[in-house]
Amino acid sequence: RTLHERWDETPLCGPNEHGDYCEDFFGGDLAGITEKLDYLASLHVTTLYLNPIFEAASNHRYDTADYETVDPLLGDEQDFRTLCTEAEKRGIRVMLDGVFNHTGAKSRYFNADGFYPAPGAAQGPISPYYSWYSFHPFPTDYDAWWGIKNLPAVNERNESYVNYIITGENSIVRRWLRAGASAWRL
């Protein structure tokens, strides 16, 4: 990750030494949004739509690494809760972006690079997440969003995946609604 000090610094153009794109970060966090709520309310803003806030390798965060963790560059769960509480006081709702048809290859669920200590789908059937993905054959080929291999597609009909994301008592959707989100963009 390249974290720039100022907004006018030149971003990296092209892949880094690992072949990854989108490694430039220009700051901005949940606490900063909270600080601007009075200004946003003065503009009659009623909804804040946040791009994905979950831990991810890229700056766009559509390659979710962990749905249970706010990306540390944005803050933490308490920062999110504070944002939602303070926004609600001003009549502003917070909408999260739910990227649930794929994860990042570098996620705790797929774990292509072995970064996480627990096995991901890339480590095979020993992983509780293996059935979330479709391999043809394992481990070299798998379904991916638009064929982009660092965005492995999930089987949205897999019962354990649906339970984890939507239907379970402590599902991701319910968890973040309880934390203060008002809506999801799917």
Language model: regions and residue ranges:
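Short catalytic-loop micro-motif centered on adjacent basic/acidic residues
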Residues: M95, A183-L186
